[in-house]
Amino acid sequence: MAINKEKKKEIVEKVDGVLQNATSVVFVNFHKLPVSETTTMRKTLRGQGVGYTVAKKTLLKRALSDRAFAGILPELAGEIAVVYGTGEDMMLPAREVYAFQKKSGGRITIIGGIFEATYKTKSEMTEIASIPSREILLAQFVNVINSPIQGFVRALDQISKKKSI
């Protein structure tokens, strides 16, 4: 479907606004994803405070050319959507898309992204997506600190039981 010049300009401005406000961006290929699953994913993402927008590759590249990101833009193959987050958790968009990618059997794929003002490859964005959330990391840290203390308390308890006998 042909898009007139005004509509193209509007799309480029929208994507540019997304890029300006986003803390991180994930480029996804959604070619094999049915509309019903796309709708489900959009609702899930929206509930998490993550945005999802679709744009033609040429218009996306035009919006990206206005921004100075380090690195090389990953190859944008297939039908491209931009998943972006504007909140404190910079890894949330990548994590949510990665979870949906595993759930959908690979019908949607991460093809790259922008993290900390640097273009990232597919593998780098997948690594970022596999990092647990801040809450989980804090819980793991507390567990690591707490384990030796628990062992020490058990040892003291056993010693006190032996002495009381």
Residue ranges of each PLM-predicted region?
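A short, charged helix-loop
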Residues: 110-134
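Short hinge/gating elements
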Residues: 29, 81, 123-130, 138-143
